Amino acid sequence: MSLKNIVFDLLYRFGKPPWVIDAPQPALMAAVSQGVIRGPAVLDVGCGTGDNAVYLAECGFSVTGVDVSTAAVALAERKARTLSVKARFVPLDAFQLATLATQFETVLDFGLFHQFAGATRARYVRALGEVCTSRGQLLLQCFSDHGGKARWFGPRLVSQEELRAAFSEGWRIEWIRPASYKSNRGREYPAWLALMTYTNSE
């Protein structure tokens, strides 16, 4: 486990990260209400404590959530049990998605893409494609640069051009829209919400 992943695991074990809001992200709820999410099988990559995954399961989707943090996965499983929701949670590195041996109609990434850059980002994008069905889709939300300047700490801010470049091969970008992340600190942060269709299987 990398140092960054160890830090995330410690955050889940001994605190409450700012992105844990004990509810689905508003942009995801809007996407569901608009019929954007296709099923039945949905994968939530970097699921954290399961806020989004549990919500999707409540909506009737067959949901698998993965996170590199075993502490986060344990919290997600507890949340699902408490709410009597059926969802599968797996402690797994995002680069090893193919080991799930399952393909999904929709893959969800709400908060992981912006952790990667360069060759690591390209490797991650390939891993996402490996678990998409033919014409499967990716709904991705990442921190954006349209609301501020890059900082020396905190999540990486992503430009729309970076998003388009990362998914220029093997994917068709359906749309990219301004959105926002809700946090448990009473603030919202600028984001991009993007929908992509996997085309390498065509």
Please place each PLM-identified region on the residue numbering.
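Conserved acidic residues
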Residues: E105
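A conserved beta-strand element that flanks and buttresses the S-adenosyl-L-methionine
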Residues: L108
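Class I (Rossmann-like) S-adenosyl-L-methionine-dependent methyltransferase catalytic domain
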Residues: M1-V45, T49-T102, F116-V131, G136-E202
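Short catalytic micro-motifs in class I SAM-dependent methyltransferases
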Residues: G111-Q115
